Amino acid sequence: MREILLTTHHENPGLPVEVHCHGFDEVDFSEFAALDLVLLDRKCAEENVACIPTLYLRQNRLAEFEQFMQRYRALRVAGRIPHLVGIALEGPLLASHGGTPAATVWAPTRHEWERLARLGDLGLVYTVISPDAFTTASGLYDNLDDRHPRLDWIVPLLMAHGVRPALGHFTKADPQGAAELVRDIVDLAWQSEWTGSGARVITDHLFNDMPLNIKHAFRTSAARAKRESTLAAYDLPNWTLADMDQIAGPVPAAIMNEAAAGRIAACINFDGEHVDLAIAARAAGLMGHANTMLMTDRCDSARIGGQELHQTDDNGLWYQDGGIVAAGSQPLARQMRNAQQMGVADAPLWQLVAGTAHRAFGTGAPAELATAGEAR
């Protein structure tokens, strides 16, 4: 693989960023009380990447997580973990938990949201939330009451502490309604006071855990036998943002159009298993590589968030019981090679793996996302 402006300078804008990952080697990041941050930083240095560890959080461990964030902040201030450029949460406010451990999906109360938001001052850079978390189809709905504030209160609170909502884990009940909620949250984020730098809104991985009109992945040998004919029918070269609502569905269309407008930094996986590589490459081109981040969803061991995982002979994904995808296994370097094999040139590849992330999280180049100037 050709090196794409890679250096070993701490937080250099050219250092690739593992934006959303769950575990390196045998370490499950969600076991944060025992997480050796200095050792993890050393591992990142060996791989020549910056990293935003993404953790799952159980409700009864919020106080422990606050202590962890204090420890993270102290090490950052001391300059001991320069490669760990932020911490992220997946959840807890998820309408559909998908591969997320069910015990880590919960609806915080007003006071719990205030505690979570304050962690932005210590380095919490985003938390995955579902725009449709408060709809009747949400898995959280039956447990909601007047103690639980809605998104019109939550989003401005997060903005005030520099914590980005990362949109994902949609139900499939009302695609059009969910797309409207995406636009509502983006509008709200851009209208709110923002104390951070870079992107105000990001996403979980595009095409995963959301309602779709297309088959986005071919994970078994039987599915792969039909891949070429399926993709030919999709006519990827003629996809446009204007038609994406009909092609892929209202939710991916809303995300892709907001990203192309520079109002979202969108994440997409290039392992070829979460999303087919041809679809991923076309989507990134439509949104603009300067508005798109390659995320790995990586876990190196058969355990995540306290749950045991397994793999199959068909692909390298990690699965929960019941055949639900929980995480990927391919590191950033492998996914960079995948993107290159799809014809992504050096300059846009650098944006996918480094430039967009450093702008989005305010760790490198100018803060505002670029409006896509690429083919629509």
Where does each model-flagged region fall?
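Divalent metal-dependent hydrolysis catalytic cores, especially in the metallo-beta-lactamase
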Residues: 18-24, 37-66, 81-96, 120-139, ...
